[in-house]
């Protein structure tokens, strides 16, 4: 079993850790962006969140939806749906001993696709911008899963 110092010497794992940090920071930013839009537009999903803006019926007017808030929220949900599988499969892939340049290509493509997807979602850019970014990231995760299943796992 590998100890921590061996993991730190594994260049593929360290590349994975670096790109994971970037994509998780981006996802964390989306959470902050959602909260920012909710506060600045005074749009809340829960009654208790409105308490600071009024009481009773006055507070209920803040229980509503807003197109901009919903767009940021959907982009964040899309991150959750795509980054979590990348983290699991990418971790296993990075520990399976892939070629460094191939692994870095996978990681870079995924991170760039997710950043571009967010830009395309929030701007909003016309389709197929967002769809292409989604499918590139999705394809990267599938590629890592295929390589992992083909070469290292017992099926």
UniProtKB/Swiss-Prot annotation:
Gene Ontology MF annotations: glutathione transferase activity
Matches recorded under InterPro entries: MAPEG-like_dom_sf (IPR023352), Membr-assoc_MAPEG (IPR001129), MGST1-like (IPR040162)
Membrane topology: Multi-pass membrane protein
Sites where the protein binds glutathione: 38, 73-74, 76, 81, 121
The entry's keywords: Acetylation, Endoplasmic reticulum, Membrane, Mitochondrion, Mitochondrion outer membrane, Transferase, Transmembrane, Transmembrane helix
Superkingdom, natural source: Eukaryota
Chief subcellular location: endoplasmic reticulum
Lumenal side: 3-9, 97-99, 149-155
EC category name: transferase
Family to which the UniProt record says this protein belongs: Belongs to the MAPEG family.
Function: Conjugation of reduced glutathione to a wide number of exogenous and endogenous hydrophobic electrophiles.
Name assigned to this protein: Microsomal glutathione S-transferase 1
Taxonomic source organism: Bos taurus (Bovine)
Gene symbol of the encoding locus: MGST1
């Amino acid at each position: 079993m590998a100890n921590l110092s061996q993991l730190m010497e594994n260049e593929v794992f360290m590349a994975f850790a670096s790109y994971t940090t970037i994509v998780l920071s981006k996802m964390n930013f989306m959470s902050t962006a959602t909260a920012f839009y909710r506060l600045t537009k005074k749009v809340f999903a829960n009654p208790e969140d409105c308490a600071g803006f009024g009481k009773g019926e006055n507070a209920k007017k803040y229980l509503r939806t807003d197109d901009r808030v919903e767009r940021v929220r959907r982009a964040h949900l899309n991150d959750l749906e795509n980054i979590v599988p990348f983290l699991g499969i990418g971790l296993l892939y990075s520990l399976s001993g892939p070629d460094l340049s191939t692994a870095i290509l996978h990681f870079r493509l995924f991170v760039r696709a997710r950043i571009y997807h967010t830009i395309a979602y929030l701007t909003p850019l016309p389709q197929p911008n967002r769809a292409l970014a989604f499918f590139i990231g999705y394809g990267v995760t599938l590629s890592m899963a295929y390589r992992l299943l083909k070469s290292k796992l017992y099926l």
